[in-house]
Amino acid sequence: MFRCPICGFKTLRLFALKQHTRREHVLVKCPICGFTGKHLSQHFYSRYDIDHLIYCYLFSSFRLPKNVRLAIKRKLEVE
């Protein structure tokens, strides 16, 4: 199972979590560092730490390397 980092919603599939976050949540500032700006998805991608990359994966269409996607998957997994 995977858990939404914003509201705690749980789902069996990672893609369903990605759909949930895009449909249910609108981000106007970075929940990690508080950045507010025009290009929030670029901000998530340029800060190359796992917390920012989770939001990059969930909210943007950037293609992340496979090892990063696997790390994100492990971080979002719950039992």
From Swiss-Prot:
InterPro entries from the UniProt entry: Znf_C2H2_type
Q: Which Gene3D superfamilies match?
A: Classic Zinc Finger (3.30.160.60)
The protein, known as: Uncharacterized protein A-79
